[in-house]
Amino acid sequence: MRNTICRLPNGQSYTVTPVFGGVNFKSNDMHLKDSIIPPGWTIVLYTNQNTDQPAQDSVPPEEERGRSRYTQGEAEEKTRTTRFTTPTLNDDCFYISFIVNPPSTDFKPPVSPTRQIAMMIWVSLYWYFHEPEPDLHLQTDAASQTPLTGKPKGEWRIHLKREGIFKGRNLLQKLERMGLIASEESSVGLEPSETQESGAWSRMFVSRRSFWQIDPRIFVFTLVPANPLHSAPSSPFISPRFASPSRESPIPTESPASPTGKDFPLHMPNEGPFASSSHLPTYFPPPPTQYTFTNGLRHPVRPKPPHQGEVFYIRFIPSVGQYLSFRVPILSSSATPSRGHGHSHSTSSIEVPPQTTPSDLDLLHKWMNDPRVSAAWGEGGPKEKQEKFLRNNLTSRHSFPVIGCWDGKPFGYFEIYWVKEDRLGALIGGADNYDRGIHLLVGEQEYRGSHRVAIWLSALVHYCWLADPRTQTVMLEPRVDNEK
C-alpha cells in the first residue's frame, strides 16, 4: 500500500490504515461539524485468485459465512481470496463493512444515506486508483508468443461485492443510476422480483477509465460560510484572485472586504468548484444542445466559462507532493494585497499569498517577454500589448484563458477552446461539435520538465472530459517549426 493519506480535491484528507481484511479511512478534519462525509469507515478489500484446485477450507462454516468473504458459487468457480497487497488488473473486490456514526451534535446526520454511501465509495476509489498501476497486459493463448509490447491490454477494474452495507434494498440500483458502478449484464433477467440472493447485481464493477470521467462534484463537496461576505476577497472586483491551493491550504479562500460602490458584482464566486451552501452536490449535467452561427458556421451554443479568478480544477498530485490547480486570470493590473490568514468552514488554516504577489497581467508580461516564449507566441512587448491580448481572450466566445498553479504559485498560461469555431476547425475539416483544443506555455523555468508536462497536460485533458461528456477529442496544434 503506497498511499497512507488520501487528499481529496475539495481540501479534506483521510488517513488510510491497513486493518484485518481491509482498509480503514479516518478523517483528518474532525473539527468540521457540518461535514457531509462521515469521519471514518472501513472497507473489506481482498484479491481473488484463480486455482485449479479450490482450497479445502475455501467454504467457511455456515455460522461464519456472515463474516467471511465467501459467496454462493465460489467453490464452483475455483477461486480463493487473499489479502490485498497491491492492485490487480481485475481480481480485487471490496465492500463497506463499517461506518463511524458519531452523535448528530458532532456531525450533521445524512439527509440521504444513499448519497453518503456514494461519497464513501468515491473517496475509497479515489484512494485505490492512486495506488500503483497493475500490469495491464492480458495473458491469452493467442498472444502467448507475442512480445510484451504487442500483447493486448485490459481494463483496470475493481469489483463491488453485495456484502456489508451494500446489502441494503435498492442500494446498488441507485449507485448504478448515479453512474458510479456498472455491470456488463445488461439484460432484464428472468426473476420477476429481486431478492437478497439475486445474482442480477452480484457482478458490479468500477473501471479506472470510467471513474476518472465522473465529475467529482457529484460526490464530493464542501460547505460555504453562512455569510458569503466572509469569502469576499480584497480585490477591486470582490472576485477572488484565488491563492490556488497549497498542501497546507488546499481550498482557496479570501478575507473580508467591503462591497461598496460600482465594484460590487452580481456574481459572488465561491470557494472553488466544490463549495455548496445547500448541502447538495454542485454538479449539473450539460444542458440540451442548441445551435447558433459564427462566421457562417453552425455550432452548439456554448456554456459560459468560469468567472475571472475562479478555480475550476484542483487535484493533489502524489508523485510531486503538490496541489495542481487551474483558474481563470483576472484582468486587473494591481498586485494582490496581503490578506493575512483566514478560516473557512471547509478547511482549517488558510494560507494566502504575500504582498509581493504579482498580478496576472504582470505574470503574462513577464512570460511573454521571455525569448523562448516570445518566439512561439509573438506577444512580447509593452504591458499594454499583453493587456489587449488578455482582454481579447476574456471576451472570446469560443475559448477562455487559464492560469496553472503548483501549490498556489502560477507557472503557466493556457487557453482552452472549442475547435469547431476556432480557425483550426476550418483547416482540419470535419471537427466534431464538442472537440476541444489547448494552447499552452510554461513561464516559470523551475516547473519545466517532461514529468510535470505529463501531469498538467493530462489534467487539462481531464478537465475537458469532465466539462462535457460529449467531448471525444482534445487537440494540440504545435507550430511547424516546433522541434519538440
Swiss-Prot record:
Places the protein is found: Cytoplasm, Cytosol
GO cellular component terms given for this protein: cytosol
SUPFAM superfamilies assigned: Acyl-CoA N-acyltransferases (Nat)
Protein's UniProt keywords contain Transferase: yes
Record region (Disordered): 51-81, 240-264, 335-355
Protein name: Acyltransferase sidL
PANTHER family xref list: LYSINE N-ACYLTRANSFERASE C17G9.06C-RELATED
Binding site for substrate: 439
Induction context: Expression is not affected by iron availability and is not regulated by the iron regulator sreA.
Pfam families per UniProt: Acetyltransf_8
GO annotation, biological process: siderophore biosynthetic process
Role played: Acyltransferase; part of the siderophore biosynthetic pathway. Aspergillus fumigatus produces 4 types of siderophores, low-molecular-mass iron chelators, including excreted fusarinine C (FsC) and triacetylfusarinine C (TAFC) for iron uptake and intacellular ferricrocin (FC) for hyphal and hydroxyferricrocin (HFC) for conidial iron distribution and storage. TAFC consists of 3 N(2)-acetyl-N(5)-anhydromevalonyl-N(5)-hydroxyornithine residues cyclically linked by ester bonds; FC is a cyclic hexapeptide with the structure Gly-Ser-Gly-(N(5)-acetyl-N(5)-hydroxyornithine)x3.
UniProt-listed SMART domains: AlcB
Organism whose genome encodes this protein: Aspergillus fumigatus (strain ATCC MYA-4609 / CBS 101355 / FGSC A1100 / Af293) (Neosartorya fumigata)
Pathway(s) of this molecule: Siderophore biosynthesis
Enzyme class, broadest EC rank: transferase
Gene Ontology MF terms in the entry: N-acyltransferase activity
Catalytic residue positions: 477
Gene3D superfamilies on file: 3.40.630.30
EC number(s) stated in the UniProt entry for this protein: 2.3.1.-
InterPro entries named in the record: Acyl_CoA_acyltransferase (IPR016181), Acyltransferase_MbtK/IucB-like (IPR019432)
Family named by the database record: Belongs to the lysine N-acyltransferase mbtK family.
Disruption phenotype: Decreases ferricrocin (FC) biosynthesis during iron starvation and completely blocks FC biosynthesis during iron-replete growth. Blocks conidial accumulation of FC-derived hydroxyferricrocin (HFC) under iron-replete conditions, which delays germination and decreases the size of conidia and their resistance to oxidative stress.
Keywords (A to Z) from UniProt: Acyltransferase, Cytoplasm, Transferase
